[in-house]
Amino acid sequence: MALNGQLCRFCAIFSRGSSTTIPWAVYALAMNTNPPAVLVTGSGRGLGKGVALELARSGMSVAIHYGANDAAAQATAEECAEMAPNPAQLFPLLKADLYEASGRDGLIDQALLVLGRLDALVNNAGITSPGRADVLENTEAAWDEVMDVNLKAPWFISQKAARWWVEHPGESRLEGGFKLVFVSSVSAEMASMNRGDYCISKAGIGMMARVFALRLAAHGTQVVEFRPGIMETDMTAGVKEKYDPIINGGKVPMRRWGQPSDVGRAVRSFLKGDLPFCTGEAIYLDGGLHLPLL
């Protein structure tokens, strides 16, 4: 795995804006590597990291996008390299601010540059409602912030990936063709009065998955939306005491926290071709949280 480590370190430097050009040998390897290539947004930590690790374990190259935490992203890349079964797998780090058009617009180009191709896109990056204000107190600034990251970014990133796929018919290294994944939330269906903007953004992701599914089906691309429930990550550590009794009390019928690996394994299964006749669907990963109970 020494080669993987060298590539990770190189790509980390490249992603931080180094003017160093990519050595021809490294670029040639990226262009001719056998593993499928996947971009996972927001994969330096949390659910996205869980996805990246599962894909790495299954033999895929993964471009690890992140916004700010260099150390966490580097650690994720190193963990991916350690568990990768194929020495040809690559785990470049791509740093981009999804709040900004420049960050969104260049992400697919960066992924294609360092991976040489793109067989799947996993839209995972997202933010919660700033301040978690009540519906009657939500500000326009907070609304715009949530929509920019949770809706505008995946829309235009997916659009750019889809254009590349349409231009490269039949070239996917994944069984069943290219794949587009949206990691959403049960909040697409379940309302929270202090996170109204967030819930609306996740509901919008559901329709986004449907329209891309309809547009790309004839081009050999499958689309799916995964809706995680209450997940145990570093970002939910501060509310663990609040949710433990809720989960144990049966609000989540399976009575446990969801794990990043639960999302990662679902994404891996879809990318590996285990759902060959599925597109445009919303699949819940919530232990039954969304199910109505009389």
Where are these regions (language model features)?
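Conserved glycine-rich cofactor-binding loop
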Residues: 42-46
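Short, small/polar-rich loop/turn modules that mediate ligand/substrate recognition or access, typified
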Residues: 122, 217-222, 278-280
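Substrate-binding pocket helix/loop in short-chain dehydrogenase/reductase
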Residues: 132-135, 139-147, 248
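Active-site helix of classical SDR
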Residues: 158, 201-204, 209
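Alpha-helical segment proximal to the catalytic Tyr-Lys
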Residues: 163, 214-215, 276
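Residue(s) in the substrate-gating loop at a strand-loop-helix junction
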Residues: 185
